[in-house]
Regions:
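Anionic, Ser/Thr-rich low-complexity intrinsically disordered regions
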Residues: 1-152
Length: 152
């Protein structure tokens, strides 16, 4: 049973470096579509902007790690051209899980939960998670998170 996320920051940093390490800035006006993301990267010599919100309940102890994960994820959007809509996020979650296996099965499942799992939650509730830690622990421990939607 998984109880915490110790060591996750180092793994996120290694994955970010291994898969592109695209420079990024944290910005409330981050792109939310593939065309906007492509334009942003083109205008800024490869730098992308990522959304800063939602870090309060993230599984990462430091918001900077959450942002680094987001930068890696958005870079994957840029590379694959998979959309920011629910089907695109679920598809990208599957794709990112497949490449995250390089850093271990647990990290790959965390990546899948962070992307596809949260997209599935949003599709079911119409809202973002209020408690990412509880959701991720239940997801990874194979709890029936669908039955506990109000918990998150």
């Amino acid at each position: 049973m998984i109880r915490n996320f110790d060591g996750l920051a180092d793994t996120v940093q290694r994955a970010w470096h291994y898969y592109g390490a695209r420079p990024y800035d944290v910005d409330e006006n981050a792109p939310d579509t593939i065309p906007k993301l492509i334009a942003c990267a083109g205008e800024r010599l490869g730098r992308i902007r990522i959304w800063p919100g939602g870090t309060e309940s993230a599984i990462y102890a430091d918001p900077k790690v959450n942002w680094m994960f987001r930068a890696w994820h958005d870079n994957c959007h840029l590379v694959t051209k998979m959309g920011f809509d629910i089907p695109g996020e679920i598809q990208l979650g599957e794709w990112q899980r497949s490449i995250a296996c390089r850093f271990g099965d647990l990290f790959a499942e965390i990546v899948h939960c962070e992307i596809a799992g949260q997209a599935e939650f949003y599709a079911a509730t119409g809202r973002f998670l209020a408690d990412q830690k509880a959701f991720t622990l239940d997801y990874l421990n194979h709890a029936n998170w669908h039955a506990n939607l109000e918990r998150y």
